[in-house]
Design a protein with these regions (language model features):
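Conserved phosphate-binding catalytic cores of ATP/NTP-utilizing and phosphoryl-transfer enzymes
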Residues: 82-113
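Active-site rim beta-loop-alpha module in soluble metabolic enzymes
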Residues: 139-198
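Gly/Thr-rich phosphate-binding beta-strand-loop-beta motif of the actin/hexokinase/Hsp70
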Residues: 1-23, 103, 110-133, 149
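Glycine-rich phosphate-binding loop signature in dinucleotide/nucleotide-binding domains
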Residues: 42-45, 106-111, 198-199
């Protein structure tokens, strides 16, 4: 049974999986030792952990995992992956290569893959039909865009909760920001999809 920890820029996602089946999942701003200990106690069959962090590595958490589990794999530029990588691995975020490997392992052979991850940033990764990771692009995420509009303008408010709107154009500032940011991301994603389809 595997403990999977994905420490992102904003949220730390934790999952327990067994032979490809999701058993439990959690989300924390940061995983404390108490929370990690509780997860380990709740799932005594855990024997391995996979740890990925885009931020600084939590050495205390890694130490706990190493003490409690037989195998701990930290995703970094040295970890072996089942795809050819046409990218400087030392400069590639562990979250990005983990997303590529996850998508590649789930997809049928011989098809091009566009792997999209929406978080603080939106990442677009391209895997060729021959299974070579060709690289990718990074764009601001939804809430990064909202924060930027608020921070870099004098009068636009910070919107915390986006609401899906039916209309194409807003009739208030709040609607204009919500629709503009959501539709901007949607069109950006659709543009990448069309580009990959055309290859």
């Amino acid at each position: 049974m595997n403990l999977i920890i994905d420490k992102g820029n904003t949220v730390c996602k934790v999952a327990v999986a067994d032979r490809g089946e999701l058993i439990a999942h959690y989300s924390f701003p940061q995983v404390s030792l108490r929370e990690a200990g509780s997860i380990l106690a709740d799932h005594p069959a855990l024997d391995a952990a996979i740890y990925s962090s885009v931020a600084s590595v939590d050495k205390t958490l890694l130490s706990l995992l190493t003490e409690q589990l037989s195998t701990v794999c930290m995703v970094d530029e040295r970890v072996a992956v089942p795809v050819q990588v046409a990218y400087d691995r030392s400069r590639l975020g562990s979250d990005r290569i983990a997303a590529v490997v996850g998508a590649y392992s789930l997809a049928p052979e011989g098809v091009p893959l566009l792997v999209i991850d929406l978080g603080t940033a939106i990442t677009f990764e391209y895997v060729s039909p021959s299974g070579e990771y060709m690289g990718g692009n990074i764009s601001p995420g939804l809430y990064t865009r909202l924060k930027a509009l608020n921070h870099f303008t004098s009068r636009l408010p910070l919107i915390q909760d986006l609401e899906q709107q039916e209309q194409a154009f807003g009739q208030t500032t709040i609607e204009a920001i919500s629709i503009g940011v959501l539709r901007g991301v949607i069109h950006e994603i659709q543009g990448y999809i069309e580009e990959v389809k055309a290859k």
